[in-house]
Amino acid sequence: LGFTAQDLIDHQERLEAQANEAFPYHVDVCTHTRGYVRQLIYACKTCGGGGVCMGCSVSCHSDHDLVELFHRRHFRCDCGTPNLYRHRPMTPYKQKTGYPEGAKPCSLRLHDSNKGWDIPNDENVYTKNFDGQFCVCQRGQHYDPETEKEDMFQCLVCEEWLHESCTSLYPKGATKPLISQDDFDTMICNACVRKEKTALLQAYLGQPGWLVVLPNENGWEVVGS
């Protein structure tokens, strides 16, 4: 259909530029009214695992246990919606209202017609990252940014976070990474390259401007330039 891997990267860069222009990191504005957009998201473990925008992370959840997820595409702020409390146990009250007892409206939307409350965000997608779990390894199941010593990268396609060593950029026992961080701006993980719906990416493996780490008889090698 005339769609290339470079188109994917160009589209992502346009989304980032639009997001930075639309949401210039204002902490006094909730982005909920803008709908499903690509933006910086924080998962609130205190409230129940929903995701909130930067403004709400500061104005409504500043003293809560937050997980910084960085950019998420097609996501609407959960503050003031039932999604914010998605992990809270079901009670008669929650079954009737959609909210647990003690739930609070979004403080940045109190003057809106719904007084800071809103309907569920049915299109939001929640990965394990929202529960504070990252990467595909055992270490990532209990991720702590205060103690994590290894660099992590976010896949352009699935937006999952992976340890440098888990992408084979830094094989076990190596003294330096196979590909320096100075040599790339974007990463696409192995799982996304192998998916049928993104198979077009495989045509670019090893092409100019597309570095790929592949296994060989001695371990790993870098193909491309």
Labelled PLM ranges:
Residues 1-225:
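PHD-type zinc finger and closely related Cys/His-rich zinc-binding mini-domains in nuclear regulators
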